[in-house]
Amino acid sequence: MMYASDGSGVNPFQQYGITTGLTAAAAAKACTLTVLKGVQNRVVVPTPIGIRIEVKVVESVRIDESSGYASAEKFSGDNPDQLNGITIRCHCKVVKKQENGRSKITISGNAGIGVVEKDGLGIRPGEKAISQGARKMIEDAVREAAGGYDVELSISVPNGEEFAKLTMNEKVGVFGGISVLGTTGIEEPVSTEEYELHLKYIVAAGRCVSKIIVLCPGNTALKFAKKYFALPDKAFVLIGDKVGAAVSASIESAYDHVVIFGLPGKLVKIAAGIYNTHSKVADGRMETLAAVAAMYGISKGAVKRIMESSNTGEAISIIEQEGIVAEVLNTIASRISNRLKADFSRSVGFSVVIIDHDGKIIGSHLDGHIKEVLKYGK
């Protein structure tokens, strides 16, 4: 899957993939069309960023006039991904037609989809690991095909429990299968070495329109950063795991100010001096959070619970119970800023904004005049 360069920073020489969420959306749309119109070979699926993607349907079966199933295969492009090539299947039942033409879409997870058992993942414990972003993609795709009919969907992954063992799911608190995720639907090859060269190009291009650059480790951060900062679109850059490379490129391009904006899972690592935040490179999240929380006098028992947490969100919920979450995360943000100044440049301003999954700012360190372009509450 290739995209031509259109000035948006898409690299035409790398293959972009699709997320598990978009793969599930393709299977769900194909299933709905199979029941209503017959066997499908390909479907075109909308994404939250306005791009429509054609996905091959690997299985399309109509059981009867109201039910059937279809499958699509995940493609990860040049991104190193253990789930590349897995099949996501959707069984569906088409029920009554709404008079107002607005289909009601019901989504459930079945075999091969993990169950969330820990706090802090943006999905309530006990629920299937299908993110809100993925659910929205599935609903939008099916609504295009449903023609006003209500549709009941059941998403499954053959051998999903085995595939999940290749991922970080159990470490973060998801058991029994994979997670169906995706903010944009597109999987960018941000963990490859080639992406560092791509970053230099994007960062340099942004300097033509802004003296301030906002570096975002993930698509969720990128989406919310644009709501908080009154800056040109090219001032926002998706950096993946390559924090050090992105900061170095920003300094080489002579930016006056660098903003690190993201979820705590990635940013806490930077506070520990980790500039490649890929899970296989280094961690230190719990140790960093526990150490900073201990500075504010929490009990040994609370420190122990933080150290035993499966994910950053769970650790932060413990800190929140202690009533010091703002102090801890503001300290983390300040520590990141100080580290970047010491390790990269003291002549460049460094600000840090930490958000939760809903985009709320939960920690920050704002350096210099950055407040002038930060739109609080908008």
UniProtKB/Swiss-Prot annotation:
TM regions (residue ranges): none
Classification via InterPro entries: CbiD, CbiD_sf
GO biological process: anaerobic cobalamin biosynthetic process; methylation
Pathway annotation: Cofactor biosynthesis; adenosylcobalamin biosynthesis; cob(II)yrinate a,c-diamide from sirohydrochlorin (anaerobic route): step 6/10
Name of the top EC class for this enzyme: transferase
Keywords of this entry: Cobalamin biosynthesis, Methyltransferase, S-adenosyl-L-methionine, Transferase
Pfam families tied to this protein: CbiD
Signal sequence region: none
EC number: 2.1.1.195
GO MF annotation: an example: cobalt-precorrin-5B C1-methyltransferase activity
Catalyzed reaction equations: Co-precorrin-5B + S-adenosyl-L-methionine = Co-precorrin-6A + S-adenosyl-L-homocysteine
Family as reported in the entry's similarity comment: Belongs to the CbiD family.
Protein's UniProt name: Cobalt-precorrin-5B C(1)-methyltransferase
